[in-house]
């Protein structure tokens, strides 16, 4: 995304952290328009009607934008290369053994690299800078409804190849749960970037956080949950199997095929839904 101006006095280094206060202090319509245009390209790739990221939303939220850009000395223009939007959210999580966790997790909410600079290491530079600024490790990151391409990127660049899908469409990695330890089923673990509480396995999960469409057996005034292993694990062809290795085609043709498949599945879901009128 191109801006016909020198943004070095405004943004500073080529990798920059923009929190809500910093974005509000920019007061530059050209920068705002360039960020919004880059976010629209991200939404277009995900087949979304409205972008997930705008400067107005960032100013009125607790999210942080990590932006990569460069200045072209020959053409005297600035180019925005990509961005990552992150925020901290309180989530209830399940591991592969259905142990329940509660914690404030660093979440990747939006991530995009301009198509003209993809596969040049820009995406990894952005995430590496984000991890250093947030004092976090790759396994501590939660992904908000990621695509197969993003899961393949995390597997290829960071070795995160065991995703655990949650019923909230967030994805965390099995290494996160392996790093936690508990005593007698209940415990707390503190990191610089997150805090988790492990629920007692004898207690049922909090209301509203049970996995949907799960058969139940009613007893004497109590509700016991029976987990079906084949239902919990999901289907590998959908790319959201519980703790299943990621098998994604990272070639340009494969990325386009993944996006086309996701758009086709989303269109079929919309057409099969009952109209509201």
From Swiss-Prot:
Its EC number is 2.3.1.108. GO terms for cellular component: microtubule. It catalyses: L-lysyl-[alpha-tubulin] + acetyl-CoA = N(6)-acetyl-L-lysyl-[alpha-tubulin] + CoA + H(+). One of its GO terms (biological process) is microtubule cytoskeleton organization. Keywords: Acyltransferase, Transferase. The keyword Transferase applies. InterPro entries: Atat (IPR038746), GNAT_ATAT (IPR007965). GO terms for molecular function: tubulin N-acetyltransferase activity. Pfam families: Acetyltransf_16. Gene3D superfamilies: 3.40.630.30. Residues 1-177 form the N-acetyltransferase domain. It comes from the Eukaryota. Acetyl-CoA binds at residues 111-124. The keyword Acyltransferase applies. Specifically acetylates 'Lys-40' in alpha-tubulin/mec-12 on the lumenal side of microtubules. Promotes microtubule destabilization and accelerates microtubule dynamics; this activity may be independent of acetylation activity. Acetylates alpha-tubulin with a slow enzymatic rate, due to a catalytic site that is not optimized for acetyl transfer. Enters the microtubule through each end and diffuses quickly throughout the lumen of microtubules. Belongs to the acetyltransferase ATAT1 family. This is Alpha-tubulin N-acetyltransferase 1.
């Amino acid at each position: 995304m191109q801006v016909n101006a020198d943004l070095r006095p405004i943004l500073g280094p080529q990798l920059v952290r923009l929190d809500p206060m910093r974005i509000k202090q920019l007061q530059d319509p050209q920068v705002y328009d360039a960020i919004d245009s880059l976010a629209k390209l991200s939404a277009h790739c995900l087949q979304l009607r409205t972008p997930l990221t705008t400067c107005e939303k960032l100013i009125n939220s607790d999210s942080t934008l990590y932006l990569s850009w460069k200045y072209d000395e020959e053409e005297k223009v600035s180019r925005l290369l990509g961005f990552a939007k992150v925020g901290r959210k309180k989530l209830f999580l399940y591991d592969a053994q259905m142990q329940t966790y509660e914690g404030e997790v660093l979440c990747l909410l939006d991530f995009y690299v301009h198509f003209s600079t993809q596969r040049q290491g820009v995406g990894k530079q952005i995430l590496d800078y984000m991890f250093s600024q947030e004092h976090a490790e790759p396994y501590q990151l939660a992904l908000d409804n990621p695509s197969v391409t993003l899961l393949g990127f995390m597997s290829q660049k960071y070795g995160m190849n065991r995703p655990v899908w949650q019923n909230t469409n967030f994805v965390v990695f099995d290494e996160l749960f392996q790093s936690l330890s508990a005593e007698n089923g209940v415990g707390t673990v503190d990191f610089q970037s997150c805090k988790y509480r492990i629920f007692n396995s004898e207690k049922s999960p909090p209301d509203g956080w049970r996995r949907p469409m799960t058969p139940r057996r009613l007893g004497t005034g109590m509700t016991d949950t029976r987990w079906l292993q084949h239902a919990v694990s999901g289907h590998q062809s959908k790319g959201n199997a519980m703790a299943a290795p990621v098998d994604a085609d990272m070639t340009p043709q494969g990325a386009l095929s993944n996006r086309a498949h996701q758009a086709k599945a989303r269109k079929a879901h919309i057409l099969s839904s009952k109209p509201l009128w």
